[in-house]
Amino acid sequence: MRIIPSSELIINGDGTIFHLHLKPEQLADIVILVGDPGRVAMISEYFDTKECEVANREFLTVTGTYKGKRMTVMSTGIGIGNIDICVTELDALANIDFATRQVKDNFRQLTLVRLGTSGAIQQDIEVGEVVFARTSLGFDGLISYYEGRDDVCDLDLERAFVEHTSWYAKLPAPYFVDANKELFELFKDSTREGITIAAPGFYAPQGRWVRVAPHDKSLNEKIESFTYGNRRITNFEMEGSALAGLAALLGHRAATICTIIAQRVAKSACTDYKPFVRRMIEMALDKLSTL
């Protein structure tokens, strides 16, 4: 069995994983991921008990219980690269023996649910609504660095999207990965469903124009008009595709759920969105406590 070199998986001197600074025993099977470290406190204030709180860089983690169910909530920071770190290190905490540096014989499946904020790209989706990313669409290219990319992606959907948008060849190839079906069933009665884009940036990658124009100024209109059967693209965020793709490759359950705080078609945004986020958090905690 392969022994993972110390240069590939760095374990700190205190037995914690390199970036997250967590020990395996500090990780629950249910993990809620948020971008903002401040949102960790917002979620963990609902916990009945707290067993640990660990902070390193932008990664703040609290493990405790909610209605008797053990959960971990962790901030990832912003962007796809941070999701690559978080999901890989969470999987290592669950499935690598730190003493032998080998994969454990018994696989431990994690449930990874991202709770985020997002901008709607369809006129009928209002600020304050909650969207479940039944499929994540990645503009980032991360999953193509991993073996097995085509095994977890919807290649027909990818081809249809590339053709519809006349996708610029110098950009990373877009990819589509479905959320876990059990998690969709869990949340479907409390959310809208759609295809959610994960962009590798906040400005031009999402069609925003401040001083430098996007390469394709009509891309958002093409995105808005794209349909595949009865499916359509509903919203933008910045992390979900890597979460869905890596979780699928590693065998974990994953989903991204976002509160809409901007209406890109109407060119409006809400800056006082915390009540909407809190409502999403309460809903998600109650749902996850039933697993």
Language-model regions: role of each:
Residues 263-291:
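His/Asp/Glu-rich mid-to-C-terminal helical/loop segments that flank catalytic regions of hydrolases
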Residues 220-226, 230, 236, 240-246:
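A short, acidic, amphipathic alpha-helical segment used as a generic capping/interface helix at domain edges
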Residues 21-24, 200-206, 278-287:
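Intrinsically disordered, low-complexity segments enriched in small residues
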Residues 241-272:
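Zn-dependent metallopeptidase/amidohydrolase metal-coordination segment
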Residues 119, 136, 197-204, 242, ...:
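Glycine-rich beta-alpha junction loops
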Residues 33, 40, 76-83, 87, ...:
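Generic structural signal for well-ordered, non-membrane alpha-helical segments
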Residues 1-175:
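Metabolite-binding pocket within alpha/beta catalytic cores that recognizes anionic/polar moieties
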Residues 156-228:
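Active-site rim beta-loop-alpha module in soluble metabolic enzymes
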